Amino acid sequence: LEVKVILVAGNNKNAYAFKRAKFYGIKTLIFDRIFFNTGLFKTIKEYEPDLIVLAGFLWKIPPLWTSNFSKQILNIHPSLLPKYGGKGMFGINIHEAVKINQEKETGITIHLVNEDYDKGEIIFQKRIRIPTNYKVEDIIFKVQELEKKYFPKIIEEYLLNEK
């Protein structure tokens, strides 16, 4: 299986993914809320993707997308869902909550996207222990290590198994 990225799209023009995509000659598309709500679905549909991968994308995916791309939208979330999921639970908010609640472990969840924030079918989770002396920054670093290590592998495995 050859995994090929055909488009990198997002609403944050400063996202590192755009620099990386340009380096590899991959098409990019930066969009605003208006285009997201009116034109992005049609544009993505024209690309005929096997999979739509979300990483750091915070806007809710509309039902039009989840019904037309059923089991084709994968997201990574920096917690062990269902804990610390849902609206407002992203980035440092999650890791601060994990620390405040003195969780013994955290991790990542890779899941399918449905109509509800962070409620789609869980495809993969990886846990790490949190030593009591860890600061929020340490937790962030460890979780990002997991994301980098496992997300590409799980994307490839998912594509292999869905064919």
List each language-model region with its residue ranges.
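One-carbon transfer enzymes
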Residues: 1-163
